Amino acid sequence: LELKGGMMKKKILVSGPALTRSGYGEMARFALRALRSREDTFDIYVNSTAWGQCGWIHENDEERAWIDSLIAKTVNNNDGAYDLSLQISIPNEFKQLAPINIGYTAGIETNKISPHWIQPSNLMNKLIVLSEFGKKGFDNGVYEVVDQKTGNKVSGYKVIPPVVPVGFPVRKSDGVELDLQLQTDFNFLTVAQAGPRKNLGNTILWFLEEFKNDANVGLICKTHLGGASQIDRENAEAQLKNITNNFKDAKCKVYLLHGDMSESEMASLYTHPKVKALVSLSHGEGFGLPIFEATYYGLPVITIDWSSQVDFLYCENKDGK
């Protein structure tokens, strides 16, 4: 969008999980920071949504106060009219909320989007994704469908608006003292929600199979099921024990790291002298923010040669990225 000088500010509604501790929450806050840098052009409003079972950010800082003020301003916007919307979600939730609508999504973590995403995506004027891999998912999502009115087959059913990849920026933080009480000197780190896509169960299983005889190797699992509560911690611990109980004679260690951590604490985790590599064996990533963060903090990464992380990871034995 190009807005000419001298015009009134454009009222933009940002709809997304801006206050949640989730990947889409990070996307929403990234978008808001970008818009904040152009407050001479945009009059910003926020519709803050939930994101599944994910928890909410608790930091009481200047950025949180600013987002809260935008939410309050939106509630008091009685006419409810906006010049454009930025909708941060999965495409099946996209709606026409303004004359100009932009969808901002991580896309799909596999090779092509669902046909059910096409119609709502075509309500948008433009789509923003997190990676070239995410863009390919839209490019590959071309289907043959049946016209419900005529019964005729229609080929080439696809997303029409342009799809533009925009990755996350580097956000380095100063570390803080972090007492992990590690009993092992060489430790792998995995940062993953305990769910099928992240493949955490197999990550732990394969670690135990490989290092069961090495008493100086550990795996730190920064994980949760859906939040940061005590109940969530107990359930996460139970899931880990379901795997580790099958290796009662293993000499290696599996550590559970649970609960909210600040950007400074995560920086200390990535740079901890006893943390030697990040491991991610997920089935697919819309972007892979922990992989990206580990990379820019200089922590070696072990992951698969497929999905969005190949946008920013380079393997010397392969051509390209």
Describe each model-derived feature in a short phrase.
Residues K126-G175:
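Donor nucleotide-sugar binding/catalytic pocket of nucleotide-sugar-dependent glycosyltransferases
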